[in-house]
Swiss-Prot record:
PANTHER family noted in UniProt: SERUM RESPONSE FACTOR HOMOLOG
Top-rank taxon: Eukaryota
Comp. bias (Low complexity): 191-200
Record carries keyword Nucleus: yes
Start-end of Polar residues biased regions: 201-210
Top-level taxonomy: Eukaryota, Viridiplantae, Streptophyta, Embryophyta, Tracheophyta
PROSITE patterns: K_BOX (PS51297), MADS_BOX_1 (PS00350), MADS_BOX_2 (PS50066)
Residue ranges constituting the MADS-box domain according to the UniProt record: 3-57
Pfam families found in the cross-reference section: K-box, SRF-TF
Tissues showing expression: Expressed in aerial vegetative organs and flowers, but not in roots. Expressed in flower primordia.
GO CC, alphabetical: nucleus
SMART domains according to UniProt: MADS
Annotated segments matching region Disordered: 186-214
Protein name per its UniProtKB record: Agamous-like MADS-box protein AGL3
Amino acid sequence: MGRGKVELKRIENKINRQVTFAKRRNGLLKKAYELSVLCDAEIALLIFSNRGKLYEFCSSPSGMARTVDKYRKHSYATMDPNQSAKDLQDKYQDYLKLKSRVEILQHSQRHLLGEELSEMDVNELEHLERQVDASLRQIRSTKARSMLDQLSDLKTKEEMLLETNRDLRRKLEDSDAALTQSFWGSSAAEQQQQHQQQQQGMSSYQSNPPIQEAGFFKPLQGNVALQMSSHYNHNPANATNSATTSQNVNGFFPGWMV
């Protein structure tokens, strides 16, 4: 997949510019060498860096000077001498104009940086002040637009985060509601099961009552008073105590405890 179209302009970052220059220079030298070997072509390549350092490549065994001389003879041999002189004069005039323009721009740049202001008169200083004010307004306007754009982006991100937060909160509430419903459903089922077990136990208790054990004291069979009275009636000596004995037996305590 291609990287897309690269905009050709000067790289502002100094380090990146140097790195790019080194990579592209080596690539260009390599391509020139490959072309000279593959196609048996005579190639001369001259590269000057922005610091003025020279990098060259020449495929001719005789060297760069001979190749350049060959190029000079080939280029100027077909030119008219009069036309060549006129072109050189025109180019020299263009060079002088460009040089003057560069000097004016450099001078103006130094003024904008606050340098060499002593040689300027009041009108020039006022003109420079208006230029600086216009530049400041332009800079502030650009800064304000940039800050507004950033603020708009931040608001958009904030709305997205709030929407995500609401979705997460809604999911959490639904999860809690489902968990609570499941808990109460299981509790109700357990209570219903316990109630059924209690109902089953009560019905079983009613259908099969427990056998009561005999008490510690058993009831007396028959009329104890009559038995004891008849027993004592056989003995005349005890006839007088029959009533007392009958009362003691019916009251469940002996006479000596009275």
